[in-house]
Amino acid sequence: ILNVLYNNVLQINPNNFSSTDRNRYVHSKGHTVEALYTVLCDQNFFSKKDLNSLNKFNSHFIGHPTRKVPGIEHNTGALGHGLSVAVGMAIGFKLDNKPYKVYTLLGDGELSEGSIWESLLSASKYNLDNLVIIIDRNGLQITGKTEEVNPIEPLLDKFQSFGLCVKQVNGNSVSELDEVFKEIPFENN
């Protein structure tokens, strides 16, 4: 998912990262930040040598996203807050009449957090067609399987009930991801 986003979709790189005129990416699924570090390294935000300090004392490369790492948009880690930040960014773009999009990756385990559902209410109210929410539906969270800990199905129906356009693809398929991202903005049927 991250490779497709950074290589084919976001158009974010070290040369334009400090610009306000660009798309945004919020990594809400903070515990998978190592995957994001790898992609950011491949995009030349920092060197592979920098990654040698991962999770070491005084390192900026810790177990959750921090803005101290080049290419990280927002600190995340507390479950469910990334979507709230992404919604706020998307509203800001709308208010400023900016054409940019905000993409955010959520883990299905964090869908148990109330702030997710509050954010969806706002996304629906403000018709945020510039917000792309990606859910990694792997069925797991820290204490077990999502459907055993706190069931979230029928997930598609829940998101559609907010008036959101929902697409389901295989997140391991580059071609499916490429295709669905090319369809943005989606037509809400």
Question: For the regions a protein language model found, what residue spans apply to each?
Answer:
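Cofactor-binding active-site loop characterized by glycine-rich and histidine/acidic residues
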Residues: 2-125
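Thiamine diphosphate
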Residues: 56-68, 89-91, 95-100, 120-189
